[in-house]
Amino acid sequence: MRKTILFLLISVFVGHSSFADKTAPEITKLKRPLPKSILFVGNSYLYYNDSLHNHFKRMVDEKYPGYEGSKNVKSSTIGGSRLKHHNLDHLLKPEAISSIKKFELVILQGGSGEGLSKKDREAFANTANEHATKIETNGSQAAFYMIHAYVEPHENFDPNLIRVIEKMYVAAGNNSQSLVIPVGLAFEYAYERRPDIKLHNLDGTHPALLGSYLAACTVFASVFNVSPVGLDYDYNGLVSTRDKLFLQEIAESTVRSFYRSS
């Protein structure tokens, strides 16, 4: 009952988002499921709090014992970077990272400031399409990690920024026929349900541990098309049982609502 109510509430939030303007994801699951090697590409939003890819790997280890992807999940990050700052040509080369011949899935995370102006959004759109094309040409799959928005006291806080982020990431996914992972929406819905929860650091931009945990749950649910609810992983007890279940349910309901909106 609790999960059903949460899903219905999030569905209402989705109805008031940019989806009212028919901006909905066209791709709702990976064309080739269960990727055995995954590369995260982004900035400090990924590497804070022991790195999102490590939390994600531990969830994969728990859900799929012996799954090869658990040792083939890597991350390439540059602090403060935007999409254009990453050398995809190099990252896609065989054994550019470890002994991995080819990453079956490449998850792209853009910079926090790429939605602040029309010029920035256009540059993001162009780079997103270029990167996705390179990834697909390599025989890999591309996915876009929709970032969270700023919160106060960040100087660029704007309550409507998440709508801009949502629209630009959905457009990037639709233009390249790539999966979009709705991390930013999960943050929004978590705050709607529990305004007191701390998903951001004090700077209003970087994720706190609970933010990274929520993001990992959202990526897990999106990539594997499976619910994270019930996972035992709690980062060695640093995520409380209450927070763990809440964030797992938020991730599950966000992903279900986002993909069902199309």
Model-flagged regions — what are they?
Residues 22-42:
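Short N-terminal segments immediately surrounding and downstream of signal-peptide cleavage
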Residues 50, 54, 209-221:
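A structural signal for well-ordered alpha-helical segments within the folded catalytic domains
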Residues 95-209, 221, 230:
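Alpha-helical cap/lid subdomain in secreted, periplasmic
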Residues 206, 216-262:
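Conserved catalytic region of serine esterases and O-acyltransferases that act on ester linkages
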